[in-house]
């Protein structure tokens, strides 16, 4: 039965139609034009096959956020904390009582602009991603016909400042640190381990015979002082080569120790935390060495730089750093490989100069002379 619009005794206009299951649906309007417009939209959606039960779309953002979070049980605790924080601080205060169907694209554009006033581009992007993922799930669940967050402009990110130390600068920094933290920073600078990966190392992860350190675990700091031990960031355990000079130092450091204890610990003991190591040991050493500003993550940058300078290709650097793909390595450290391309051209030039030198000087070819 086709839908229809009829005027009720109370003066309201009632629009009626039957959904895909044959159930009658109705809504009342004060104006006939609004009733006809709504009915036409429902019938069009039914014809396209993307009709949504209006009752399902009336669930609030707060209610739906719990459904969405339940689908994220696989997340690392630290990532889940970030999602929950975005919901608690930004999403729910603004949208918690709003029905999914009442959110508009324009509303989201204004909301993102408001967040940017107080928060960084990275934080704003993350908050928008949380909202967009919730709406995307609602579309897949048949509660919305489209994700109104699609097309909302994300703030442009600024890359963290990269800093590449020379071999001499690494030595200067290490000289300002007490044992074994001098060994720690040199290990970071020549293996590219993330700080959490270094904190997760056990003595048995160091293979002195092969000159490898195996990254099996990573330690993440949670809010309120919590810690979480998990597989490395890409969930891929990896063996990272260690330069011979560093193997010698590690041999002296681990000899006589059982395999199970952490390779590095806090003082006077316990798990090594970046939140303690950086302000109490690393930052003062950086100042004394005259290398400020510098962060522990810059030692990872340094490892990439030293590897490329030694002739390592992008695939080798990717495996060393534990990136998900070589394209990610190129994206993060494109400048390093630009310099490598210059070196390739110079080496090709040196190899070809003897054979093609006269041609390169403009000598031309016999065939070209005959043609003239």
Regions found by a protein language model. Give the residues of each.
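C-terminal secondary-structure termini that scaffold catalytic or DNA-interacting sites
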Residues: 1, 175, 210, 219-246, ...
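Short, surface-exposed polybasic/aromatic micro-patch for ligand or macromolecular engagement
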Residues: 2-58, 233
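Basic, Lys/Arg- and aromatic-enriched nucleic-acid-binding interface segment
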Residues: 11, 121-129, 140-201, 209, ...
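N-terminal core-binding DNA-recognition domain of tyrosine site-specific recombinases/integrases
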Residues: 19, 24-30, 57-62, 67-148, ...
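Catalytic-site neighborhood detector that most strongly recognizes the C-terminal catalytic loop/helix
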Residues: 32, 156, 164, 219, ...
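Major-groove DNA-contacting interfaces characterized by cationic-aromatic clusters
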Residues: 53-60, 101, 146, 157, ...
């Amino acid at each position: 039965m086709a839908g229809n619009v009829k005027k009720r005794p109370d003066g309201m206009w009632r629009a009626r139609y039957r959904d895909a299951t044959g159930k009658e649906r109705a809504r009342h309007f004060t104006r006939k034009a609004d009733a006809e417009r709504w009915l036409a939209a429902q019938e069009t959606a039914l014809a396209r096959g993307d009709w949504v039960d209006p009752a399902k779309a009336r669930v609030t953002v707060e209610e739906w956020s719990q459904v969405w979070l339940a689908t994220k049980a696989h997340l690392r605790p630290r990532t889940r904390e970030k999602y929950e924080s975005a919901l608690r601080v930004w999403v729910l205060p603004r949208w918690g009582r709003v029905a999914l169907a009442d959110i508009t694209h324009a509303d989201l554009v204004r909301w993102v602009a408001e967040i940017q006033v107080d928060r960084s581009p990275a934080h704003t992007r993350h908050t928008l991603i949380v909202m967009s993922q919730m709406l995307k799930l609602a579309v897949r669940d048949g509660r919305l016909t489209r994700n109104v967050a699609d097309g909302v402009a994300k703030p442009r990110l600024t890359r963290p400042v990269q800093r590449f130390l020379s071999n001499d600068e690494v030595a200067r920094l290490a000289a300002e640190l007490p044992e074994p933290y001098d060994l720690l920073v040199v290990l970071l600078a020549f293996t590219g381990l993330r700080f959490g990966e270094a904190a997760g190392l056990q003595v048995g992860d160091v293979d002195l015979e092969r000159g490898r350190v195996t990254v099996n675990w990573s330690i993440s700091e949670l809010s309120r002082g919590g810690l979480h031990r998990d597989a490395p960031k890409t969930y891929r355990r990896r063996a990272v080569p260690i330069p011979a000079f560093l193997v010698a130092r590690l041999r002296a450091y681990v000899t006589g120790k059982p395999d199970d204890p952490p390779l590095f610990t806090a003082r006077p003991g316990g798990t090594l935390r970046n939140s303690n190591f950086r302000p109490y040991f690393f930052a003062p050493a950086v100042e004394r060495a005259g290398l400020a500003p510098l962060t522990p993550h810059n030692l990872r940058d340094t490892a990439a730089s030293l590897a490329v300078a030694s002739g390592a290709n992008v695939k080798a650097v990717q495996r060393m750093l534990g990136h998900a793909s070589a394209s990610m390595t190129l994206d993060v450290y494109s400048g390093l490989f630009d310099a490598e391309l210059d070196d390739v051209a110079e080496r090709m030039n040196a190899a070809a100069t003897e054979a093609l030198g006269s041609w390169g000087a403009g000598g031309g070819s016999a065939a070209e002379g005959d043609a003239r």
